[in-house]
Amino acid sequence: MAKIKITWVKSTIGYKFDQAATIKALGFKKLNQSVIQDDSSAIRGMILKVRHLVVLEEVT
């Protein structure tokens, strides 16, 4: 399965609680942290929900 690298670049302060919960569900603990996840439809849906807070890169 393909992998994607997600980097958390903007704080969740001032945004709804469910967006902060989505950031935690993606595996983030600190701002500017990067995680590598499988490229699945569930992960893509979570990224779509917080697309204004993260940066996405394809990993080859």
Swiss-Prot record:
The keyword Ribonucleoprotein applies. Pfam families: Ribosomal_L30 (PF00327). GO terms for cellular component: cytosolic large ribosomal subunit. One of its GO terms (biological process) is translation. Keywords: Ribonucleoprotein, Ribosomal protein. One of its GO terms (molecular function) is structural constituent of ribosome. CDD domains: Ribosomal_L30 (cd01658). PANTHER family: LARGE RIBOSOMAL SUBUNIT PROTEIN UL30M, MITOCHONDRIAL RIBOSOMAL PROTEIN L30. Belongs to the universal ribosomal protein uL30 family. Part of the 50S ribosomal subunit. This is Large ribosomal subunit protein uL30. It comes from Dehalococcoides mccartyi (strain CBDB1). The gene is rpmD.
